[in-house]
Amino acid sequence: MKILSVFFLVLFFIIFNKESLAEKTNKETGSGVSSKKKNKKGSGEPLIDVHDLISDMIKKEEELVEVNKRKSKYKLATSVLAGLLGVVSTVLLGGVGLVLYNTEKGRHPFKIGSSDPADNANPDADSESNGEPNADPQVTAQDVTPEQPQGDDNNLVSGPEH
């Protein structure tokens, strides 16, 4: 322990002496004195060039104003694009909903309107609703009564029995 303390004390004195010797040599040669200290003692010029600082501040302020203008243009453009994206997504979601609804009902995917079975069964209903009566309505017996299957009815499969 005593050896370590002696060793550290010797190192401390060596470092301290080097610094003190360096200061003494700088004072003698005059090379250790900074230029700011020379200006203070010698002439009446200020240490800081105020005109350069003011011109730098003005340039930075102009750059900030320019950046803010660009940011405002980008902000407007992004808000317009966001609005358009909202409209497009709304239209797409509505179209997907319409297609899903119509396919579930068994209609054409893009049909808009009522889903009356009478409209789907009678394609001539559109012409009658327009005020154009059919000149030759030909109704046959097959149109009125559906065909009955011929043969044994026991071969037909019914749901609750099987």
UniProtKB/Swiss-Prot annotation:
Give compartment(s): Parasitophorous vacuole membrane
Question: Where does this protein have compositionally biased stretches of type Low complexity?
Answer: 114-130
Query: Could you tell me which residues belong to the region Epitope (deduced)?
Result: 120-137
Start and end residues of each stretch annotated as Disordered: 109-162
Q: What is the effect of changing residue 136 to G?
A: In Ag5.1 negative strains
Q: Which Pfam families match?
A: CRA
Q: Which UniProt keywords apply?
A: Malaria, Membrane, Signal, Sporozoite, Transmembrane, Transmembrane helix
Signal peptide feature range? 1-22
Q: What is its main location?
A: membrane
> Biased composition, Polar residues: where in the chain?
137-162
Q: Where are the transmembrane segments?
A: 80-101
Q: Name one GO cellular component term.
A: membrane
Q: Supply any other comment.
A: This protein is addressed to a new compartment within the cytoplasm of the infected red cell. It also surrounds the parasite, probably in the parasitophorous vacuole membrane. This antigen and the circumsporozoite protein appear to have a common epitope.
Q: What name does the UniProt record give this protein?
A: Malaria protein EXP-1
- Show the taxonomic lineage: Eukaryota, Sar, Alveolata, Apicomplexa, Aconoidasida
Gene name of the encoded protein: EXP-1
